[in-house]
């Protein structure tokens, strides 16, 4: 390679790095803006939870970006998984959903996933497994959850799910609460004393997990939850404090592999 070719290649690589850094910045800004949008009021938070209820395999930060770009997404995966494992080709012209990965290692970068709606089947194609609960599954699913979280007192399935979700949150919320207190500065939570901070976090987390579980299981959350029970979301007014709530809410409390039946 000549010196001129080396200089040209180096210029191309530098330009590419700048372009990628700019795209990463734009996606990061999108995540922050979406975090602000979904904590402005209860309706925004519920809209996010509706999407998150279908995306339990993803971390909160990724759920947030999927919601920002494709709120109607039902099953997302990388192109390689669709092509090689599922035998489904991504349709021409489909726009990938950008996710930020590698931040925990100090090397953040963008990776892209595609919703099943952006794919088409080819010979030997597999349908993605979409978690669904029908009425005949209530008893075995509730029994499986109660074996993990303890028996409840409620008889009606939706109320039993509410009770189970509250028990599950009580097991995990303390581990997230300490870190939340460190990051409360600059948010509406900053003015809360320790007791009120804990109450707000626990109650908002409980209602959020209940809403998500009810939605995932085909119930209408408004039949069991009032908007007032989710009103605490407006206190999580910075991305850093929302991050703690979102991570706690997206913990895999209830996933198909934890249950005794497959649908």
Write out the residue ranges for each language-model feature.
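N-terminal accessory/interface modules of nucleic-acid-binding and processing proteins
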Residues: 2, 8, 14-263
